[in-house]
Amino acid sequence: MISLVNMANMQASRGLTFESGWKLDPPTIEASISSLAADCDPRWVSYQTPYHPESFRRVQSYVKFYVPYELHQSHIRDHWITPADSGVSFTTEMLGFLLDLSLPIIDNYLPNESTGGQIASIAAGLEQEKDREAGIAKVIDPSSGAFESPAVYLSLSTTIEIQKILLARGAKWLFMRAYAKQIKNGRMSMELVIFDESLELVALSQQLCPSVELSRMKTSKERL
């Protein structure tokens, strides 16, 4: 592993500043933070990944995702995120972790072979909503985290750029968009951007993510 870090005091930074005119394209679907917090925004559904220590998606259980009902395009994943623990806030130090936490893009292209795509996340979120209304809170995945997926996605290389320091008390809500620029021969080039509640850019990341097909991993283990 090779890591290069360039640090600076952003609060003391001074220099030329201009409005570039850059915006998200397509624009994000409108959301009300108060409605999201109350799980009543008609355009978004909440989804929390059930935790199980043997699940390869267990790390996502620390964040509650809000997924739009409307699907932009298959190569885009939009989410509002908030800590699963109501006593926690997102801090600047957590941004590197959050930038590696997007729900999987490739699963959008394989809806019949995976449970991580947007359609599956919406369906799971609606089931969780029914459970909440019935007074059922599922925090453990009883099936050993057996999420269906054709492959495991790895971060081979990652660059992270912090554009804004979060407040010292942290942030309860952030918006994240992940989008693939190319998916070819088992390699995905993608970018992730994080915004605060006012949709001001906080951080961005470029990533190269190879995919390892689970069937190939199983075959390799059997040969050992």
Feature annotation, model-predicted:
Residues 1-224:
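Terminal targeting signals and extreme-terminal segments of soluble enzymes
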